[in-house]
């Protein structure tokens, strides 16, 4: 690909290969130059570090075509905890884009850092959002103790997104206040319908989430499929 200036590949699936950073860095350089952009990119479980993913996202941002062509982005199972990686991911997502399916599950991406970008660039096309097995924040303890607020963009995104059909925030240890903001945002959204919401394995029964569900879920009209399994509700 790197040696072909006229490469026509627009869909690339390298999932479950040991690409590592030494493989993704030259690929990133190529991504920055693809004249037709990229439509489908699956790099799940490729043993990438935050530095490698950060370089990739910087290249996708540099290539202006990708903002108007990339509809599928799967980075699941790679390590993306580094601040620079999160920054570059957010920079790409914050620009107007056409990403329809976004999977960054199991990447250690702090969700509270992500939603400002989603609100700015992903409210029109995004239909499938998989954020499972990520921490809501690396300051979750402060949020629980009331020392910090949930970012306003978190609720605003769910209130204003226009096409979302699937939301997976399972295994995220969502604080009760985050759950409340998510549900209230969806309750305000009159554009969505038939949404699937996965809240499984969030320990909602142990951290006040059950009370939030009881008080808020009745106002959420857009959700038709709700997964609350493995939450210790009622114990």
Please tell me what each predicted stretch does.
Residues 1-235:
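Leucine-rich tandem repeat or coiled-coil scaffolds
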């Amino acid at each position: 690909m790197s040696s072909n200036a006229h490469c026509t590949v627009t869909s690339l699936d390298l999932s479950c290969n040991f690409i590592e950073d030494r493989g993704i860095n030259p690929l990133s350089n190529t991504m920055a130059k693809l004249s037709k952009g990229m439509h489908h990119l699956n790099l799940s479980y490729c043993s990438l570090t935050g530095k490698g993913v950060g370089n990739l996202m910087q290249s996708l941002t540099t290539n202006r075509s990708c903002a108007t062509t990339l509809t599928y982005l799967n980075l699941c199972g790679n390590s993306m905890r580094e601040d620079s990686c999160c920054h570059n991911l957010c920079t790409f997502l914050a620009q107007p884009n056409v990403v329809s399916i976004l999977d960054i599950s199991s990447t250690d991406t702090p969700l509270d850092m992500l939603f400002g970008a989603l609100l700015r660039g992903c409210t029109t096309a995004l239909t499938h959002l998989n954020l499972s097995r990520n921490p809501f924040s690396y300051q979750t303890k402060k949020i629980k103790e009331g020392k910090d607020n949930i970012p306003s963009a978190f609720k605003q995104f769910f209130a204003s997104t226009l096409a979302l059909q699937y939301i997976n925030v399972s295994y995220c240890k969502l604080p009760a206040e985050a759950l409340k903001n998510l549900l209230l945002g969806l309750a305000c959204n009159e554009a969505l319908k038939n949404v699937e919401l996965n809240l499984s394995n969030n320990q909602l029964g142990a951290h006040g989430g059950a009370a939030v569900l009881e008080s808020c879920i009745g106002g959420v009209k857009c959700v038709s499929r709700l997964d609350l399994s493995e939450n210790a509700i009622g114990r």
